[in-house]
Amino acid sequence: MRTAVDTGTIQEYMACLSEKVRRLINAYDMEETREMICEAMKEYPDAAQPHNLLGILMETQGNHVSAMKHFRAAWVLDPTFLPARENMENFGSFSKPGAPAYTMED
């Protein structure tokens, strides 16, 4: 397991992970994306961000049901993590979804 000493802070690690995942999804490298997210989930099982990112990946691959499960898991783990809530609202509506929220800045 990584520690805060290994990676700076958990927040910095998650911010870096989010940006890497965004780039990999945009480059259609789904396998590496999944591996990176799953590793983060193992290292930080209580973090909302990896679930949100896996939800984005699932939605990108057309697996809406799994995507919504991971967005909900992220929201349950951290109700203050707004990207998960935004993605649930965005992808759970009947209108055409907008861009996914990877970070608080999205």
Question: Where are the regions that the model predicts?
Answer:
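Helix-start (N-cap) detector for alpha-helical repeat units in TPR-like alpha-solenoids
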Residues: 14, 48-49, 82-83
